[in-house]
Amino acid sequence: MRVVFLSPRYPPEMRQFTRGLAEVGAEVLGVGDGAPDPELRRYLADYLEVPSIMDEEDVIARVHGWVRGRSIDRVLANWEPLVIVAARLRERFGLPGMSVDAVRGFRDKQLMKDRVAAAGLRVPRAQRVRSVVDVWSALEA
């Protein structure tokens, strides 16, 4: 199984996921914004260093070009800020895993509450605010 793993070196605990994937036989293709040290490198079949792992559009474009011609089985990100970019890559490559829509339901807390309420469960009253004026309006409601 060939796995693209986003940010295998940060946060530090991601190194253990990288090691675990390799130890169970996965071919791990790492993507991150810093060079892997020799200890981590031994668990990576290949590594793509990008200028900023947080630049979604750039990461998607670079990964797309980098894996061209290789079969990929999974795209994983265990660090919460990267789960949407992982979902976008999965959708682009037609791979299994959570979709962008599903992931947004976990990342966007207002959307999460709306979905839980739509399923018939009670949730605390809440609304999205984007400004100080919105905060005061919410408090007065």
Language-model-derived ranges and their functions:
Residues 1-102, 107, 111, 133:
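ATP-binding N-terminal substructure of ATP-dependent carboxylate-amine bond-forming enzymes
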Residues 108-141:
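Active-site nucleotide/adenylate-binding loops and adjacent lid/helix of ATP-dependent enzymes
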